[in-house]
Amino acid sequence: MIGIDIVSISRIDEMINKFGEKALKRFLNESEILLTKSSQNAAGFWAAKEAFSKALGTGIGSECSFLDIEISKDQKGKPFFTTKTLNKFNIKQADLSISHDGGFAIAAVILLK
């Protein structure tokens, strides 16, 4: 299952400027907030979570919320979905790629059940 999402970094930046950390807490877990040092990073996580939900076939909603999906980073900074997230949705393997360019963040996700 494949999911892709793109988001304007300025959209996330505007949310953060308007609502502060409260905005981040609507779509990021505490551990993720510690990893996001910029609007660019936050936008990448937003796109990754949207892409995950699309690959799952549910979209963001009652079956799969932003806070149900948790992202971490390895020692080299590569993002990945936590084991907790994979177990919650019965996913055997997940691949995640996030990129930023031209004012946008994009994420691609492949899930195997």
Curated annotation (Swiss-Prot):
<dbReference type="InterPro" id="IPR002582">
    <property type="entry name" value="ACPS"/>
</dbReference>
<dbReference type="Pfam" id="PF01648">
    <property type="entry name" value="ACPS"/>
</dbReference>
<keyword id="KW-0808">Transferase</keyword>
<feature type="binding site">
    <location>
        <position position="50"/>
    </location>
    <ligand>
        <name>Mg(2+)</name>
    </ligand>
</feature>
<keyword id="KW-0443">Lipid metabolism</keyword>
<feature type="binding site">
    <location>
        <position position="5"/>
    </location>
    <ligand>
        <name>Mg(2+)</name>
    </ligand>
</feature>
<keyword id="KW-0276">Fatty acid metabolism</keyword>
<comment type="function">
    <text>Transfers the 4'-phosphopantetheine moiety from coenzyme A to a Ser of acyl-carrier-protein.</text>
</comment>
<keyword id="KW-0275">Fatty acid biosynthesis</keyword>
<comment type="similarity">
    <text>Belongs to the P-Pant transferase superfamily. AcpS family.</text>
</comment>
<dbReference type="GO" id="GO:0008897">
    <property type="term" value="F:holo-[acyl-carrier-protein] synthase activity"/>
</dbReference>
<keyword id="KW-0963">Cytoplasm</keyword>
<dbReference type="GO" id="GO:0006633">
    <property type="term" value="P:fatty acid biosynthetic process"/>
</dbReference>
<dbReference type="GO" id="GO:0005737">
    <property type="term" value="C:cytoplasm"/>
</dbReference>
<protein>
    <recommendedName>
        <fullName>Holo-[acyl-carrier-protein] synthase</fullName>
        <ecNumber>2.7.8.7</ecNumber>
    </recommendedName>
</protein>
<keyword id="KW-0479">Metal-binding</keyword>
<dbReference type="InterPro" id="IPR004568">
    <property type="entry name" value="Ppantetheine-prot_Trfase_dom"/>
</dbReference>
<dbReference type="GO" id="GO:0000287">
    <property type="term" value="F:magnesium ion binding"/>
</dbReference>
<dbReference type="InterPro" id="IPR037143">
    <property type="entry name" value="4-PPantetheinyl_Trfase_dom_sf"/>
</dbReference>
<dbReference type="InterPro" id="IPR008278">
    <property type="entry name" value="4-PPantetheinyl_Trfase_dom"/>
</dbReference>
<keyword id="KW-0444">Lipid biosynthesis</keyword>
<keyword id="KW-0460">Magnesium</keyword>
